[in-house]
Amino acid sequence: MANDAFPGAPDPRGVTAVDGTAKARIERAALMLFAQEGVDAVSTREIASAAQVAEGSIYRHFKSKEVLAEALFEAIHSRLFDLVETALSDAESFEDAVTRVVGVYCQAADEDPALFEYHLIHMFRFGRIDRDGRPDPVTLIAEAIARAMENGDCPPGDPELKAAMALGLVLQPAAHRMAGRLPGLMTTNAPALAHAALAALKAD
């Protein structure tokens, strides 16, 4: 991976694109620059320079910088939805479901830290967009909690609030890692985070 100053070859990993393609380099360069400077502060010229492509190449793949920025967010948002959906369908109990969901969030954070952190930072910008049929991992989690309440596996309460409480116990450590306060892999801490999330969900 190229370093933060982009002095060498661009990172070839794609977000939605095939690794090694021009589109992949554009996505990865934009991701890194958006993380460093914010979406609004980055120009398409800077993205093109970091990706080592002509500026016009960006518009062959994305209608605008904002479309590119949103596409990066939606990619990890959809990825988390798929991971959570699988975790919930494979779970044998409520406790197992909590452990699995925490595990897949930690897995996603470790597999592509830059993309996961981008999702975390830009949730307020893109996460509030209302679009029919949009896959939403948090909705899946809240619905699972509501079912657990109906089945007596979780104390009654507001499923959305409990989902926020449980996810916060995963996402805040991820934010600490992003700030350099928590070294190491998220998956290493997954058992402790799952235990804490389950305790929060079981609280009256």
Feature locations, PLM:
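C-terminal peripheral helix-coil segments that are non-catalytic and often amphipathic
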Residues: 1-11, 107, 139-150, 175, ...
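Helix-loop "lid/cap" segments that line or gate small-molecule binding pockets
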Residues: 87, 103-110, 121-124, 149, ...
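Basic, helix-initiating cap at the start of DNA-binding domains
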Residues: 1-37, 41-50, 67-70
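Amphipathic alpha-helical segments used for helix-helix packing
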Residues: 106-128, 176-179
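Amphipathic alpha-helical linker/stalk segments
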Residues: 14, 72-99, 141, 146
